[in-house]
């Protein structure tokens, strides 16, 4: 376990930063390119551990993929061209890979076995395997397909109209991807609208997708046609520097090419409501995935209540929002965030435990947390528990803590932001 020592940042964070490619879009670009007809070129790809796991799995199924830094070429096999893997498909730490790929494997007439690391082994798969089984896929795993490893024997599927108990883009996407080769029209209805990268990208690859309120539909039998994909910066990665810019004294940051998909910009809405000083300059209006340059500077924040429909739009940003709340005047309440319990760690528990070690006044609730601002943080030894977003949040916390902060298991940040610590160091000079 590698550790990192973070010293207080006395002169603020200043400068321009180009945010690495969006993880969600990078995964999908590789997967959709693999099952499309023709060659897909991806620019702005995120070469983090999770997305490299996706490349590795599809190579194992006979897809020709060449990756050179943030540029990837995928020679598509079409929906029916994937080959039965000779080895176990290892997704590493990537929940997106295992859940979306399960949808593709469910409609493919061969046998596969899918597993990941210790964190993946604890994450619930039944939310995906149950609807796929209803469509006709043969799936098994520990505790009747609840946990990995999963075995999948795909084949002829029938479309379903599925009402998901959770607002999850991974669940929705798995069902829609299975539906590409299912007989009939597949429909997924969610309690709240989740991120819509799958729908946008399927349309870019030539698939007709219908959206009606909280329901998404597609007809089986549609082919994907290769296209070039430009991946914007990941707003979830940008969130750490947005909060850093707001809470570290004497800071002014310009974040370039940040993805502004409206199903992902809850963090922007929350910072605005908390009183942060920032500007958003759109740079590619009309694109399938909008992007902007964001300038943010040190701000006086106030506590707010966060819950309801906005939660799926910022679920991954809650750890760093909690940190921002420790520096806000008043109380911040985060609720309706049960999904935090089934992330890389139980993020309710880890956020509360680690911020408490730094002197924050924060308490866990069943579906979120309550943060009492404003807290003066003090350096301590903390742990990411292998969770990239916890690791990065703690690094930003260390920048405003008195004395040094030691982060154990700091290399976890490489899952989504391999250059995070280098960028942080550069901006602090």
Curated annotation (Swiss-Prot):
This entry carries the following GO cellular component terms, namely:
cytoplasm
The record ties this protein, via InterPro entries, to: Enolpyruvate_Tfrase_dom (IPR001986), Enolpyruvate_Tfrase_sf (IPR036968), EPSP_synthase (IPR006264), EPSP_synthase_CS (IPR023193), RNA3'P_cycl/enolpyr_Trfase_a/b (IPR013792)
Pathway in which the depicted protein is active: Metabolic intermediate biosynthesis; chorismate biosynthesis; chorismate from D-erythrose 4-phosphate and phosphoenolpyruvate: step 6/7
What Pfam families does the record point to?
EPSP_synthase
Its family? Belongs to the EPSP synthase family.
> Could you give the subunit structure recorded for this chain?
Monomer.
What biological function has been recorded for the protein in this entry? Catalyzes the transfer of the enolpyruvyl moiety of phosphoenolpyruvate (PEP) to the 5-hydroxyl of shikimate-3-phosphate (S3P) to produce enolpyruvyl shikimate-3-phosphate and inorganic phosphate.
Name-wise, this protein is: 3-phosphoshikimate 1-carboxyvinyltransferase
Phylogenetic classification of the source organism: Bacteria, Bacillati, Bacillota, Bacilli, Bacillales
């Amino acid at each position: 376990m590698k550790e990192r020592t973070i010293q207080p940042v006395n002169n603020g964070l200043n400068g321009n930063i180009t945010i690495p490619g969006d993880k969600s879009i990078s995964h999908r670009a590789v997967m959709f390119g693999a099952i499309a007809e023709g060659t897909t070129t991806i620019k702005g790809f995120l070469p983090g551990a999770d997305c490299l796991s996706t490349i590795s799995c599809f190579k194992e199924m006979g897809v020709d993929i060449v990756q050179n830094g943030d540029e990837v070429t995928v020679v598509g096999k079409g929906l029916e061209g994937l080959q039965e893997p000779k080895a176990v498909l290892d997704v590493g730490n990537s929940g997106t890979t295992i859940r979306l790929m399960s949808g593709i494997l469910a409609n493919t007439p061969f046998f596969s076995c899918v597993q990941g690391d210790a964190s993946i082994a604890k994450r619930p798969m039944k939310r995906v395997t149950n609807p796929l089984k209803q469509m006709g896929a043969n799936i098994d795993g520990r505790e009747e397909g609840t946990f990995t490893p999963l075995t999948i024997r795909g084949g002829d599927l029938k479309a379903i109209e599925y009402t998901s108990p959770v607002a999850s883009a991974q669940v929705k996407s798995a069902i829609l991807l299975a539906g590409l080769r299912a007989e009939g029209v597949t429909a997924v209805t969610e309690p709240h609208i989740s991120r819509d990268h799958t729908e946008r990208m399927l349309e870019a690859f030539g698939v007709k997708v219908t959206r009606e309120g909280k329901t998404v539909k597609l007809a089986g039998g549609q082919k994907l046609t290769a296209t070039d994909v430009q991946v914007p910066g990941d707003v979830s990665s940008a969130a750490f520097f947005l909060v850093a810019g707001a809470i570290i004294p004497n800071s002014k940051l310009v974040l370039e090419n940040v993805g502004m998909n409206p199903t992902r910009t809850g963090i922007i809405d929350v910072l605005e409501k908390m009183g942060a000083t920032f500007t958003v300059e759109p740079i590619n209006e009309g694109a399938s995935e909008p992007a902007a340059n964001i300038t943010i500077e040190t701000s006086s924040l106030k506590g707010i209540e966060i819950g309801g429909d906005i939660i799926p739009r910022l679920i991954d940003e809650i750890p760093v929002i909690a940190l921002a709340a420790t520096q806000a005047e008043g109380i911040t309440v985060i609720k309706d965030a049960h999904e935090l319990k089934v992330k890389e760690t139980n993020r309710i528990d880890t956020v509360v435990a680690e911020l408490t070690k730094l002197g924050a006044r924060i308490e866990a609730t069943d579906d979120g947390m309550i943060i009492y601002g404003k807290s003066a943080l003090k350096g301590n030894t903390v742990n990411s528990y292998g969770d990239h977003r916890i690791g990065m949040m703690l690094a930003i916390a260390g920048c405003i803590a008195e004395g040094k902060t030691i982060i154990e298991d700091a290399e976890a940040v490489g899952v989504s932001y391999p250059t995070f610590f280098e960028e942080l160091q550069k901006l602090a000079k």
